[in-house]
Every structure is written in structure tokens, then in C-alpha cells.
Regions:
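Assembly/oligomerization scaffold segments
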Residues: 1-99, 145-152, 156-157
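Charged- and aromatic-enriched interaction segments used to assemble
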Residues: 82-158
């Protein structure tokens, strides 16, 4: 069973175990989004800015709610919630990099890229030293994707 846990500042606002539909996209190119639909009356406490945890025995993802839309289907009010993985926060202006110059282990580069954010790095399989130089403004998420490409690796979210 998969639980969809909606929180605000760490406080649980709702737990959904039964939904009309749900879709998780977790692709090798770095895209990680989640969308689910529930009956509107059950979702009246959901709005943009909340966090959604997708949790089961094999899954553990953390998302931000970015869009909530309502519709009617056969006379039933439906609420659709669209979410982006927490790593999308790295696209925010506050995390932009003017430049970045790193030489060393990929795991240390990951730590450096995530420093000062709400995210932490997990297991980093590549160990061959790398050089990553960025000399124009970019988001930390773009820099993270460059690191992944440079290592020939994949990103796995949780």
C-alpha cells in the first residue's frame, strides 16, 4: 500500500491511501513529478506550497505541491494535485550560482552543490575524480544535472 501524506511545516494535514488516480514520473533525465486526483471534499485542505510525501515499503519521495485544480466528472467534484520533487527548489533564484569550479570526488562535488539548501546528497556511486567548471550563471539544479552527466551516472530520488 502507498500512502500520500500531505504536510505543512512538518504537521500532517491529510493522509490519502485511496485516490481516483495517481501518476509518478521518475526518469533518467532528472524529471521527477507526481500527480494525484481525489474527491474534492477530501482535498479541501490542500493548496500550493504544501509538501507531499509518497511512502510505501519500496518508495519514499518528497514533493512540493505546485498546482491544485478542480473539475467535475459525472457530477463528482475532483481535485487534481500536481507536485514537483523537492530538488526542483534548486531552480529558485536564491540558489543560483554565478560560477562554480570544482575538482575532486563526485561525492564532494555533490555536497558542495547542495550546501546551503534544504537537500542532502545520498549515495554517490562514481568515485573517479572529476572537474566541473561553470563560468556563467545557472541554477544549482542545472549544475547538479551537469555533474550527473559528467559522471555518466543517474539520479535516484527519495
Amino acid at each position: 500500500m502507498v500512502d500520500i501524506i500531505v504536510t505543512e511545516n512538518g504537521n500532517v494535514r491529510g493522509v490519502f491511501t485511496r485516490v481516483i488516480s495517481a501518476s509518478l514520473t521518475d526518469s533518467l533525465n532528472g524529471e521527477c513529478t507526481f500527480q494525484f486526483s481525489v474527491i474534492s471534499s477530501a482535498a479541501k485542505e490542500i493548496f500550493t506550497g504544501l509538501e507531499v510525501e509518497l511512502k510505501s515499503d519500496t518508495l519514499n519521495y518528497l514533493f512540493n505541491v505546485v498546482k491544485v485544480s478542480k473539475s467535475l466528472s459525472n457530477g463528482i467534484a475532483i481535485c487534481t494535485v500536481e507536485c514537483e520533487h523537492k530538488s526542483y527548489e534548486l531552480n529558485n533564484d536564491e540558489y543560483k550560482l554565478a560560477e562554480f569550479d570544482f575538482e575532486g570526488a563526485p561525492s564532494e562535488c555533490l555536497i558542495s552543490l547542495l550546501q546551503g539548501t534544504s537537500l542532502t546528497g545520498g549515495i554517490c556511486d562514481p568515485t573517479v575524480p572529476i572537474k566541473l567548471k561553470i563560468n556563467r550563471e545557472c541554477t544549482r539544479r542545472a549544475a547538479l544535472m551537469q555533474l550527473i552527466a559528467l559522471c555518466g551516472g543517474e539520479i535516484e530520488y527519495n
